[in-house]
Amino acid sequence: MTHVPQIKIPATYIRGGTSKGVFFRLQDLPETAQVPGPARDALLMRVIGSPDPYGKQIDGMGAATSSTSKTVILSKSTRPDHDVDYLFGQVSIDQPFVDWSGNCGNLSAAVGPFAISAGLVDASRIPHNGVAVVRIWQANIGKTIIGHVPVTNGEVQETGDFELDGVTFPAAEVQLEFMDPAAEEEGAGGAMFPTGNVVDDLEVPAVGTLKATMINAGIPTIFVNAESIGYTGTELQDAINSDTRALAMFEDHPCYGALRMGLIKNVDEAAKRQHTPKVAFVRQAGDYVASSGKKVAAADVDLLVRALSMGKLHHAMMGTAAVAIGTAAAIPGTLVNLAAGGGERNAVRFGHPSGTLRVGAEAQQVDGEWAVKKAIMSRSARVLMEGWVRVPGDAF
């Protein structure tokens, strides 16, 4: 029996925010994977180690969490006034598919640094010392992200003293601006509030009717009050992720929320859409102990938020969900805004399982409709490994 040898593909393994992923230049992928389709999906699944019925991704670069089962493809931008096109693929851990329906806000922090180092940004736009402004086209959702990347001696500066809760070591700060984050390109997926309301009654079988804010900003997100589903808003991962009843309940929320938001036509479609919408529960500020053991005081935050990604409670906060939080907080009457104390505000600091995060948003009413010019937050990014990733030659 002859066995097909492995091939090697240039790749870089990078931490961005509180996530990690495998980054590729589009031109480095095998020819059949340079275009969307089954070959590309099969390749990325094999790289990450999916589908894995054991749920461990031992035979790949993934680490069996939603924060680490991620891939990114970058290329020089084909759009005016942009430097790089950024495509994100969320690889299912135990199912054979890649979800292309949304962005990863955390890995967005690594796009600018990688694009500069990979030669995808025009050299004339990179200062010898200072901050490079990288104009990113987020191809999944058709939106612009501006990355502010520190540069020292003509190279991306990765080390620094910026601390990010959920990441053990300090690094250089990368500020991100998510421009016009509501909805998707040309309005696909609906307006900022797809139902037309800042709060709706959401019917979830086996749970009941819940007050919910369903917003499409950064990423489609469903916010509910913690107390309405029996939680305090101070929970850490084990409280949810080891509770089969809780996991079953949270599996239903995105299905029925996605229907109301117009993201799917029937509940069955939700099985192929694990990445969106996100579900989060909120409450007013309170004291709690983060997963690191650090005490978070109510006085240090405006509200508490816990969010789920791919059916599990996130260890910190998804970057795109943070954009949704900042946007919803800026609009009076949403559940997020009310949990933060109500009124108009252009920034909030919220508590999550690993600590706190500040996010800002510029919101205004135009002809009676709310619009958000941009959402702003800071993350960090660091290359962990670069070289080649290997996969069997017949894997795609």
UniProtKB/Swiss-Prot annotation:
Residue spans crossing the bilayer: none
Keyword terms, alphabetized: Isomerase, Oxidation
Enzyme class at the top of the EC tree: isomerase
Coiled-coil region: none
Documented EC number(s): 5.3.3.-
UniProt catalytic activity: 2-methyl-trans-aconitate = 2-methyl-cis-aconitate
Residues at the active site: 104 (proton donor/acceptor), 318 (proton donor/acceptor)
SUPFAM superfamilies: Diaminopimelate epimerase-like
Any single Pfam family the record assigns to this protein: PrpF
Other comment: Could be involved in the catabolism of short chain fatty acids (SCFA) via the 2-methylcitrate cycle II (propionate degradation route), however it does not have a 2-methylcitrate dehydratase able to produce 2-methyl-trans-aconitate.
Subunit structure: Homodimer.
Protein name: 2-methyl-aconitate isomerase
Lineage: Bacteria, Pseudomonadati, Pseudomonadota, Betaproteobacteria, Burkholderiales
